[in-house]
């Protein structure tokens, strides 16, 4: 079985092949996320503590967290599950995955070092690989370099050197800083707030004008109604007087 061991503190990882079954026996029947000592791998691993993070069997099927079996099963997976990437929106598919329990049928077991031991492991803990990309958000850059709000973040952005071309000057590349507060940003914010106040004022004026017009229309309608009532009562009185005069 091969062991893919990574050390996040240095950014390194190493693939070692272990043929001795006795060295691998402590890993058997352990689940993903289980932590155990790596002393069984040899004297140079004394004091190291590793966490099981996953693995693949001999046919290439991955281990899946939460499947409490040591064998292979077929599960109906969607976009919220690991071990499957849907090609269409809402697509589900039945895929073969291996359970989260380690056994001898695995070809690769992934381990993460969570505690360093006494000795350095060549190619794993004795060198550091710098991160290729630095933080992009302004608040993350401030946190990384312990800056205050008055400091200019643009001077501290992590630049990435580009490979040199023959006969040309060496260049570097920097990411666009997100959420950076500049005078232009503040000006846009003031413009947005002014536009919002203008809309509120216009809406209030329109509402007052509409209320005034509605009251005027209701008053006119009421006057017309009263006028109709008066005219109806007047015509009714005239007809009564005409009928009495004929008699």
Curated annotation (Swiss-Prot):
Ribosomal protein S6 is the major substrate of protein kinases in eukaryote ribosomes. This is Small ribosomal subunit protein eS6. Residues 217-247 have a biased composition (Basic and acidic residues). Belongs to the eukaryotic ribosomal protein eS6 family. The keyword NADP does not apply. One of its GO terms (molecular function) is structural constituent of ribosome. It comes from Aplysia californica. InterPro entries: Ribosomal_eS6, Ribosomal_eS6-like, Ribosomal_eS6_CS. It comes from the Eukaryota. The gene is RPS6.
């Amino acid at each position: 079985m091969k062991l893919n061991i990574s050390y996040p503190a240095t950014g390194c990882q190493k693939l070692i092949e272990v043929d001795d079954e006795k060295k691998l026996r402590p890993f058997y029947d352990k689940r993903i996320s289980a932590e155990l000592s790596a002393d069984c791998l040899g004297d140079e691993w004394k004091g190291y503590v590793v966490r099981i993070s996953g693995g693949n069997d001999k046919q290439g099927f991955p281990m899946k967290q939460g499947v409490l079996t040591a064998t292979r099963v077929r599960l109906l997976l969607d976009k919220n599950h690991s071990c499957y990437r849907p090609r269409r929106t809402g697509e589900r598919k039945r895929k073969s995955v291996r359970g989260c329990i380690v056994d001898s049928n695995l070809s690769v077991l992934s381990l993460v070092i969570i505690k360093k031991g006494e000795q350095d492991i060549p190619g794993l803990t004795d060198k550091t690989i710098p991160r290729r990309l630095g933080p992009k958000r302004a608040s993350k850059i401030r946190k990384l370099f312990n800056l205050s709000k008055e400091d200019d973040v643009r001077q501290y952005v992590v630049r990435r050197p580009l490979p040199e071309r023959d006969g040309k000057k060496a260049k570097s590349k920097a990411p666009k800083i997100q959420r950076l507060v500049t005078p232009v940003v503040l000006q846009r914010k003031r413009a947005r707030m002014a536009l919002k106040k203008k809309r509120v004022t216009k809406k209030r004026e329109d509402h007052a004008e509409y209320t005034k017009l509605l009251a005027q229309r209701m008053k006119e309608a009421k006057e017309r109604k009263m006028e109709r009532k008066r005219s109806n009562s007047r015509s009714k009185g005239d007809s009564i007087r005409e009928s009495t005069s004929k008699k």
